Amino acid sequence: MAVPGCNKDSVRAGCKKCGYPGHLTFECRNFLRVDPKRDIVLDVSSTSSEDSDEENEELNKLQALQEKRINEEEEKKKEKSKEKIKLKKKRKRSYSSSSTEEDTSKQKKQKYQKKEKKKEKKSKSKKGKHHKKEKKKRKKEKHSSTPNSSEFSRK
């Protein structure tokens, strides 16, 4: 039947390398069992080897390259934002020099004069249209009034 020493409570799945039940063998990164017969466990993070030094150097180089790239990207973003701000300032800026004031006042006068001319042309064209309508009405009235006047004279 069941083996007396193999209860579910007493047997627990764990790491075969270090014996720690908190993780499985493929997840073991921190500890190594020095002697499989004894319960002595060695912390890998406290030990150093030549391979790890080389790996650390490579990691440091890679991290430095990544930091440089990130810094360059940030600088580019800052420059672009500064350029945008400069463009906005140029658009908003109004110049206060006397020559530009004269130019702007001349331009304003010219625009005002153009608007007045357009208004005059529109009003003239409207007047012309009204005159034509009035002439047509007068002609109709003359034609209609002449027979009426003749009718009154006949009676």
Curated annotation (Swiss-Prot):
Q: Name one GO biological process term.
A: RNA splicing
Gene Ontology molecular function, alphabetical: nucleic acid binding; zinc ion binding
Keywords per UniProt = Metal-binding, mRNA processing, mRNA splicing, Phosphoprotein, Zinc, Zinc-finger
Modification type Phosphothreonine: residues: T146
The UniProt regions of compositional bias labelled Basic and acidic residues, in chain numbering, are 66-84
Q: InterPro entries from the entry? A: Znf_CCHC
Q: Report biased composition (Polar residues) as residue ranges.
A: 146-155
Which segments carry the region annotation Disordered?
44-155
Annotated Basic residues bias: 85-94, 107-142
Where are the Phosphoserine modifications? S52, S96, S97
Induction description: Down-regulated in the brains of Alzheimer disease patients.
Q: What PROSITE patterns does the database record attribute to this sequence?
A: ZF_CCHC
Zn finger (CCHC-type) ranges are 13-30
Subunit-structure text: Interacts with SREK1/SFRS12.
**Record's PANTHER family?**
PROTEIN SREK1IP1, SREK1IP1 FAMILY MEMBER
Function comment: Possible splicing regulator involved in the control of cellular survival.
User: Could you identify this protein by its name?
Assistant: Protein SREK1IP1
Give the gene symbol: SREK1IP1
